[in-house]
Amino acid sequence: MKTTKFNIENLDLFYGENQALKSINLPIPTRQVTALIGPSGCGKSTLLRCLNRMNDLIEGVTITGKLTMDGQDVYGNIDVSDLRIRVGMVFQKPNPFPMSIYENVAYGLRAQGIKDKKHLDEVVERSLRGAALWDEVKDRLKSHAFGLSGGQQQRLCIARTIAMEPDVILMDEPTSALDPIATHKIEELMEDLKKNYTIVIVTHSMQQARRISDRTAFFLMGELVEHDDTQVIFSNPRDDRTRGYVNGDFG
């Protein structure tokens, strides 16, 4: 396995009295796609949100155990805003801001006080190219982002994320609201993005996990049942529960 970006050790998470994650131990490799799979409510999205401390925003959450990124304690004395720049997130439904295509991508930089137009122009173009969207929008950058198709909006959100130069991109079912053609474009994009970023994706699609991920982790009722190379998980899993899930015996 490649070098480890995240290392998760004995992680427990509670929503009040309800335990959502149970003693999770999982290494996440650098510059690969790691897919988190399992039935609804199994804890995969909860774990994803631990990686950039989005769960901090939920009242009553308690987390124990250890989670490090490049050896640094994610739940230690760190700047959470900086963490969420380094660990960007793309959500299930495209969520462009109510502004132009250009300003969507430039938004984070402007929020950091960057005003130099040449620099902004360069980052916007580079980010849109990185999200495989530049050729489709380069002649209408001042147009409202809501005029884009759903698939284009999701790639715009990816461009907005990579404009901040993160180390990691988290994706929470990023294609579930998209048609097959748009889904295919996002999947192709992930293959290219992993050359520069560590990607962790939650998906309900077994076919998608098999197509796009290098590693797969299977969750069930808050437990990590097993994790391995994706080919192993789908062809020769160690646990009968994993075999049953990937074969469609339950969902």
From Swiss-Prot:
Keyword Membrane in annotation: yes
Lineage: superkingdom: Bacteria
GO molecular function list: ATP binding; ATP hydrolysis activity; ATPase-coupled phosphate ion transmembrane transporter activity
Reactions listed under catalytic activity: phosphate(out) + ATP + H2O = ADP + 2 phosphate(in) + H(+)
Keywords: ATP-binding, Cell inner membrane, Cell membrane, Membrane, Nucleotide-binding, Phosphate transport, Translocase, Transport
Enzyme class: translocase
Signal peptide (UniProt feature, chain positions): none
Gene3D superfamilies, per database record: P-loop containing nucleotide triphosphate hydrolases
Domain ABC transporter: 6-246
GO cellular component: plasma membrane
UniProt keyword Transport, yes or no: yes
Family assignment from sequence similarity: Belongs to the ABC transporter superfamily. Phosphate importer (TC 3.A.1.7) family.
Cited function: Part of the ABC transporter complex PstSACB involved in phosphate import. Responsible for energy coupling to the transport system.
Record-given protein name: Phosphate import ATP-binding protein PstB 2
Phylogenetic placement of the source organism: Bacteria, Pseudomonadati, Pseudomonadota, Gammaproteobacteria, Vibrionales
